[in-house]
Amino acid sequence: MAARTVIIDHGSGFLKAGTAGWNEPQMVFPNIVNYLPCKENPGPSYARRRVSLGIDICHPDTFSYPIERGRILNWEGVQYLWSFVLENHRREQEVPPVIITETPLREPADRKKMLEILFELLHVPSVLLADQLQMSLYASGLLTGVVVDSGYGLTRVQPFHQGRPLPASGKTLEFAGQDLSAYLLKSLFKEDCDRRCLFQLETVAVTQMNKCYVPQNLGEALDFRERQQSALDESNTYQLPDGSRVELTPMQRVAPEMFFSPQVFEQPGPSIPRAIVESVESCEISLRPLLVSHVMACGGNTLYPGFTKRLFRELMGDHVSSTKATVWEGSNRNFSVWLGASVVAHLSTYQSEWMSREEYGEHMRM
């Protein structure tokens, strides 16, 4: 099924899509749609609005995230984004087979709705719905270990053995990249913060990408940054998109500490290291050393400088000092879900997991 298979990894923050077999997705864009006034039909009907991709600069208050915290909330937006991807991969009017990744948090009715959109509205010939965390595992080339995926909407921890999730061992933490963004937005702009202001959103994004890091010791890092500030260190300032300059506080620079000390940022716990330990401790004793020695870090938040080093130190120092911990970090770990699905597209052992349009029709008639 690998030939021309299109993979859509639709997360809370970004959609990553492309043809199986590539080293990375060819399309990566924010999980955002906006609704513009439809001048052709000004009446009181549904058609008064038109869906489009991203944030419209003339109507910045009309955008929506179709998926939030791993849950699909806007099916119209999801359909539009999937349609956009498939139109860009269509050849000679032929729609390709599709792998859609899905979160373990999906509602029972979500799978039915996903298949309905794909087969009845987008007319795909065959579909494979793939678990996101399992795909991250396959991207690493391993079958046993702990997948730690921290993205925009969720942070998830799941132990696997022989390619299968171990029952009742997974943990979902509802603090992730969007909470870090919200903290920076509020601390940078205070009472003027507006999550629909394009300038503020761009400022936060630039700050996260260029200035934030995970400290190895929060207290020491804050003391060091305080000394730098008193010395007017240029590394604490940067230029905003409008040309003005802002000086970052020490706490803003080390905001990714949130993943290791959530209580400092008034976020619910546990921390990521603690969640890993609790997940491993819920598994059979004989499996625990093997699991801890294969901790796979993936997702955009793991790209912050110092993240994997701090994770290793905490696993070794505070929680599992009796076991040799190893943190695996791939260079493309931001795309690990997509890359794992690309591997699955070539596996003959997964052929039985695919559903064809004919099988869908028979299932619906039952």
From Swiss-Prot:
UniProt subcellular location: Cytoplasm, Cytoskeleton
Keywords linked to the UniProt accession: Cytoplasm, Cytoskeleton
Protein biosynthesis as UniProt keyword: no
SMART domains documented for this protein: ACTIN (SM00268)
GO molecular function, one term: structural constituent of postsynaptic actin cytoskeleton
This protein's GO CC annotations: actin cytoskeleton; actin filament; axon; cytoplasm; membrane; NuA4 histone acetyltransferase complex; synapse
Database matches in InterPro entries: Actin, ATPase_NBD
Superkingdom of source: Eukaryota
Primary location group: cytoplasm
Pfam families with a match to the protein in the record: Actin
Family: Belongs to the actin family.
Designated name of the protein: Actin-like protein 8
Organism: Homo sapiens (Human)
